Amino acid sequence: MCTTKATIRMVLFTLISLVIVPSQLLILVFSKSSGAYILPQLWHKALCFVFGIKIKYIGKPHTDQQTIFVSNHLSYLDILVLGTTLRASYVAKKDVASWPVFGFLSKLQQTAFISRSHVDARKEKYALDTMIENKKSLIIFPEGTSTDGRIVIPFKSSLFSIALRKEQSNIMIQPVTLAMNRVNKHAVKTQDDHDLYAWHINMTTPLGEHLWRFARSKGAEIYIYFHAPVDSNEYSDRKILAKVCHEAVSNGLTNHNKTTKE
């Protein structure tokens, strides 16, 4: 039964992608404005439904102006989860671009790929600057990796410099907490529970195998906490700004865990 369900889900994943991808490619030829995020958002919503990912929203995303959404990171599935409500471009590590299927699909949401290579640094800085100048909102995962969702590790501050450049004076930063609430229709308790949704640095499971295992499950319930926006104009030090955002995201996870245990 689980294998049949997983097969149906993977077939639906393929069919939905085959419908949306050509249309999105055509749209991107003519426009990369806010309208170019509509189909990816529909794709994310459809796939969350197909894979049984239920999302609870606490708070509201800041959409009144250009915003950098700063979130903890548990899994490649976070892309779908956040994509259901945020019309923004992801900033991802360069190796994501080479992932089978997901690498290609991520480009359809105008993802900016970055690396630690000095050779690529200037080109990547130009790409990010262009996105900021074009008033695009961004989604970043400043932990620099993914975790099993138990804690939020310290943020790397480098990407926060985007919001502190003198020529950028009207960018808000909104901390966002992702928290697993339930997997397979029960509370998250064991490491296996965490690893059903999370795909993190301490795992050796290939992406495809992990997705298949998740497809065989009863899905997951994920909470998204949108915290109070932070005005980048009030900061001049990216490390302090990163620490402030980390505290908001980390406290959000701690409070969620306390609430669910009561």
Task: List each model region and its residues.
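Catalytic core of membrane glycerolipid acyltransferases/transacylases, capturing the structured
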Residues: 20-30, 35-36, 49-50, 65-119
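Generic beta-sheet signal
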Residues: 65-71, 136-142, 171
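Soluble extracytoplasmic domains of inner/organellar membrane proteins
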Residues: 128, 132, 136-140, 144-155
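A transmembrane-helix-recognition feature enriched in membrane-embedded lipid enzymes
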Residues: 1-57, 104-108, 219
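A cross-family acyltransferase "interaction/gating" segment
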Residues: 102-103, 150-236
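Surface-exposed cleft-lining segments at the edges of enzyme active sites
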Residues: 110-117, 148-150, 195-198
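Membrane-proximal, solvent-exposed terminal domains/tails of membrane-associated proteins
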Residues: 227-231, 235-236, 240-242, 250-262
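Short histidine/acidic/glycine/proline-rich micro-motifs that form metal-
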Residues: 29-34, 145-148, 231-232
